[in-house]
């Protein structure tokens, strides 16, 4: 299954709508796609997590690897976390380091200087 089901741009921000499952394969693809976006000059990536219904430890690892690879090259943020996904990210401590928003509008505005 692909890591995301839709890609769109809103101004300088690329929004990737994640697929319902985030496992090793999807996490690896997500890392590859986000790296490609950064290589092509995009500096703002927003992950729409509203469809995610399952994430395993390898999916968490892929998400973390993606976030770490963005580093100083750009910004990666999340929005629309379902309760299950939010709880997983809280337990793992990732919500302390990753910016997340409930609303796409707030998330998009957070990229403004």
Question: What are these language model-derived features?
Answer:
Residues 111-112:
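Short, hydrophobic alpha-helical segments
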Residues 1-17:
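Short beta-strand/loop segment at the start of cytosolic alpha/beta domains
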